[in-house]
Regions:
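Signature of extracytoplasmic/envelope-associated structural regions
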Residues: 2-245
Length: 245
């Protein structure tokens, strides 16, 4: 039978689930599930002050205050739903708002323009729209009336798209509050078997700082979520739970 003196090792990353917070402060319906995390870090910090006195003005009594718990999640993959939650494109219930649209703007580098057709990089032929306002030529020697045959030009067109998902980021919307539960495994020193372990955070605030890195070299981009743990309406700020399946 397990005791509080049993020791365990931790190596595996967490799988994380975000939940709505109900009106009575309990954990509600799931909003987002993450099972592709690379790193999941829970950090607790606090400030400290002490009463000093006597010879050498040494510390006599110490107080801790301003406790903060933060969580950092580094995800190898993203979805439209996870980006919407990270950037604050959510409704009143904290659910992601991802719109659909039928048209998108594309700018192409054009090597030839002839009879309304252009040859795109990669050999794909594309017919330019003829409606006024849908094509804009950026090269000085190319216009809609006298296209010519420039060495290169940039043409911006409105095209019909497929399976488009659009995330609108407004100046007055920010990421919301959620409950968060992280699931992982810890390994017993005695048996060598893995046992289930949970980090339960009844109330966290998704931080607004988001960095989206697009680069040609190096490792694939990861997507970071930074959470600040808040005090819930009832109960502790965080629970660490070991259990057997």
């Amino acid at each position: 039978m397990a005791t509080i003196l049993d020791r365990y090792g931790v190596k595996e990353v967490m799988d994380g689930t975000f939940y709505q917070i109900t009106e009575d402060g309990n954990i509600g319906a799931p909003v987002l599930y993450l099972d592709s995390l690379k790193v999941s870090t829970v950090e607790q910090t606090a400030e400290n002050t002490s009463a000093r006195g006597g010879k050498g003005n040494v510390e006599l009594v110490s107080w801790d205050f301003n406790k903060e718990i933060t969580v950092t999640l580094e995800d190898a993959l993203f979805s439209a739903k996870s980006l919407a939650i990270m950037y604050g494109s959510v409704n009143a219930n904290g659910e992601a708002v991802v719109d659909t649209t039928e048209t998108i703007y594309r700018t192409f580098r054009v090597d030839q323009i002839e009879n309304g057709k252009v040859q795109l990089r990669g050999g794909k032929e594309f017919t330019l729209p003829t409606e006024e306002g849908k094509v804009k030529y950026y090269a000085a020697d190319v216009t809609a009336s006298t296209q010519g045959a420039p060495e290169a030009a940039y043409v911006t067109v409105v095209v019909d798209g497929k399976s488009i998902q659009e995330i609108d980021i407004s100046p007055d919307t920010f990421p919301g509050n959620y409950a968060f539960v992280g699931d992982t495994y810890i390994r017993s020193e005695i048996t060598g078997r893995d046992e289930a372990f949970q980090v339960i955070l009844p109330k966290v605030k998704m931080q607004s700082e988001v960095t989206l890195t697009l680069e040609a070299d190096g490792d694939p981009t990861t997507f970071n979520m930074n959470l600040k743990v808040l005090r819930p309406a009832k109960g502790p700020m965080m629970k660490l739970v070991k259990y057997d399946l």
